[in-house]
Amino acid sequence: MRELDPDESNLLLDEQLSIRDVIEQGPFSNVYRILHGPSNRKFLLRSINLNLFRQHTGLGFEEIDEEIRICQNLQHPYICRLEKTINSVHYRHIIFENMEGNDICFEIVQRASNGFVFSEYVVSHYTRQLLDALDYCHTRKIVHRDVRPHNLVLASKDTSAPLKLCGFGVAKDLSEIGGSMACGRVGVPQFMAPEIVRKDRVSCSSDIWSSGVVLFLLLAGRLPFSGSTSDIYERIMQTDVDVDGYMPNISESARNLVRRMLNADPSKRISAKEALNHEWIRDKEHMASRKHMNDVIDQMRRYNESRKLKSNVLSAVNSGRFDETTPRQDTPQTAFVDGSSPGGDCCHRGESSSNDAAEPPADKDLSGAYKVLGSLDAINSLLDPNSYKPGSTTFQKIHDDGSVRNLLRLYDKIKALPCEPVVTEVDTSTLRKETLNQIDGLLGPSPEALELRQLLNSPHLASCVQALDVVVCEIRDPKNEASGSGDKEGNCVSSDPAPAYLNGGVLPLGAQRAGTSFEHFNQSAVHTSYDEEEEELYDCMSRLRLVQFQKDTQEPMGITLKVNEDGRCFVARIMHGGMIHRQATLHVGDEIREINGMSVANRSVESLQEMLRDARGQVTFKIIPSYRSAPPACEIFVRAQFDYEPSQDDLIPCPQAGIPFKTGDILQVISKDDHNWWQARFVSSFPSIGNSSNAQRSNQQQVAGLIPSPELQEWRTACLAMERSKNTCNTHCMWFNKKKKYYTTKYLQKHSALFDQLDLVTYEEVMRLSQYRRKTLVLLGAHGVGRRHIKNTLIHRHPNRFAYPIPHTTRPPRKDEVDGKHYYFVTNEQMMADIQNNEYLEYGTHEESMYGTKLETIRNIHKSGKIAILDVEPQALKVLRTAEYSPFVVFIAAPNLQGMQDPDGSLEKLLNESDVLRQAFGHLFDFIITNSDIDDTIAQLERLVEKLPAYPQWLPVTWVY
């Protein structure tokens, strides 16, 4: 659909709404992101052109009104909320809540690229939200009929954002028609249930089939059905779903749920409510694997790329540019509608007349796009291993398709060209029209001008110009592909845009000058003979680029260089946030030949860095690009688990580029390109609770700095430990030995294997939540520092908030002792059996009787709504530090000895033990309180626990996913 008419824009302005961005273009509706001026709130606007809707679908306006009515009645946290509707003579404007996130598949791939784990656990998390939304709809007898990734959108970019079900354009209310209805093929072919393909009566169970296909996609990374639309229909009706073949590494519990959701018989298909009670959804903590599914991400990335290209092609066809050269007043705009596009990227409406997509469109303007979309489906089928199974005819069908072979041949020829196209943001059609107007305005045009006008009026040239604009502006969309420059400060970057070839466009062979017009490139010249020893030189000359920018300040360029054995200079590293990174002019691996006309061959790195540091004004690089594919963007947050000072690190390439930090500080990792040195920014210092952070330091660290990677730090720590162990007289060796012995006291043996490398802690991935309720308060500290008194005082003052888990014991009860009040009295055999089943947090023996704290007693405290308060040994955190117990760990530090008398040395011993605990377990602390005064310590703890649930907190990502 073309842009909004001026009258409609004015109507929105009357409501104080302004369009900020175009999200999606359809044949009869567009989706925009809008801003409400008074409240400064963003919303999503779907504008439906009523005339185009009737022309393309053959349906009445009551279909739109039913969608609005259904959305108005749906109020659920996992369903996109309708805010308002605005009606006019020619349009229906539907305003929804704003959603900043991508659809589920794009969001998963993006988060995996940023370093987040994608596992069955994550899939179960989002599947539960989808099923919860569908159960809400189905309880009200509303069938969605278009459940697919496109309509499953994350509410925001935040990693804890919920899933939102949207796209109710073909939803139906079955409450008044007996819970089922007869209809045609509705939805997207790959997600249609068998009864929809057969055009039988459909019910809410059809949504479960579509959700099963979505679940299949999330677990396998690919769709269960591929090929042409007719092939997809045939396979769906055969219910040929190879769950085990596509998911060999997925748990049987997950595969069982997929099979039950993809049951061909609607009456036997699992319902949304039953699926919510499935063990893989209900008990994901134990049934869903947390192992990262890298192969699934790779497959889903291919699926997303194909889907994005299809979406861009459809958006181009549905845009106004597609009809610019052939305006028609009496016919509707050219568009794929209601199943006329192959590949299932348009939602079919079974109520209209043409919904089987059996034949190519009659409109010749769409035939080329139809072939491209069809070829993408063929390519997806070729990538499907099931296409090559015995008995499968998919591969032979594709092989016999002449149009697919021609397109693949054309692709090979394009990839074989020795140069790349120079893409500009100039609207060529507008430029053509302006040139024609200028020629028509001449009083006495020259013969050359008349000839130019004849050429520009040629229908062939007009069609080529139109195709160029459609590809550049609609399909390729340079705005989205550019690696944004971010900051554009006037002091650092020239405000004048550099010519295209200066910003990365390749100079074609034969070009004599810069600009957009080049001499004709004769392809035969590429194949002229030349000596083999000149091949490398020829390749370098054909790839040579000029990079130019303005440098008028003392700001470093933000790159490091390296010189190889041959004296050639390469870009070794680009600091994120630096000048070069913001301008995106260089890339890691680019070879630099000249700087401001001076050769850099056989020069030292120091002299080259000095040359860059002293450069002012216009700086020109002559480079040979590496054409290395850019690594995926990485933006994750970590909590440092060790202290680091770059000025004391002999291994760091550039100490000035390093970031110092302390244990517990929060860092934002920007790049993991270098195996040994990550790039990161400082976020906040320990303790990272609330909105407090080191703002001054954060502002100084806008440019990323270097931190050691986990592999490098683990190697360094292991080497230091080995060196220390060689000297038995070394005090540090004694400390390590004492520490190993310390582990064995009251320690759950099952979990010790998981923490054998406790000394090798580096970083913990975290995420920030605005609110979070901790379930357990853990008090750590040296023996005698006052933890027991603090615990008892808190429980006595706040019995409705805190509770202590009653221990279990094998000794007989004493007089006046009540089972379940003072102790839980159990037999020795029962306690040993529970210990073998790892049901105890910690246990020990005293006077031939066993005592222990059972995990179930802690869970019971949580169920009662209280906070479990524990004064345990530090090793217990290896069990407690999970989402199930959500502990807030407070270290009660011994006071300083200054000004205190210590006749027997007990205070010094207490302080030394406290320091040992801080060194060994400091990375597990959330807060530290120095116990100089016991009453002040208790008051500080009370205030902290009172305000903590409402404070923003940095939590391990494993607690959220």
From Swiss-Prot:
One function term, GO molecular function aspect: calmodulin binding
GO CC terms of this entry: cell junction; cell-cell junction; plasma membrane
Domain Guanylate kinase-like: 774-946
Annotated segments matching region Disordered: 318-366
Residue stretches spanning the membrane: none
Any one Gene Ontology BP term: protein localization to basolateral plasma membrane
PROSITE patterns from the UniProt entry: GUANYLATE_KINASE_1, GUANYLATE_KINASE_2, L27, PDZ, PROTEIN_KINASE_DOM, PROTEIN_KINASE_TYR, SH3
Domain Protein kinase per the UniProt entry, residue ranges: 17-281
UniProt domain L27: residue ranges: 365-422, 428-479
Region (Calmodulin-binding): 310-320
Pfam families per record: Guanylate_kin, L27, PDZ, Pkinase, SH3_1
Alphabetized Gene3D superfamilies for the sequence: 2.30.42.10, L27 domain, P-loop containing nucleotide triphosphate hydrolases, Phosphorylase Kinase, domain 1, SH3 Domains, Transferase(Phosphotransferase) domain 1
Domain PDZ span(s) in chain numbering: 545-620
UniProt entry tagged with the keyword Protein biosynthesis: no
Stated family: Belongs to the MAGUK family.
Function according to Swiss-Prot or TrEMBL: May play a structural role in the induction of the vulva. May be required for the localization of signal transduction molecules (such as let-23 receptor) to either the basal membrane domain or the cell junctions.
Protein name in UniProt: Protein lin-2
Organism of origin: Caenorhabditis elegans
Origin organism lineage: Eukaryota, Metazoa, Ecdysozoa, Nematoda, Chromadorea
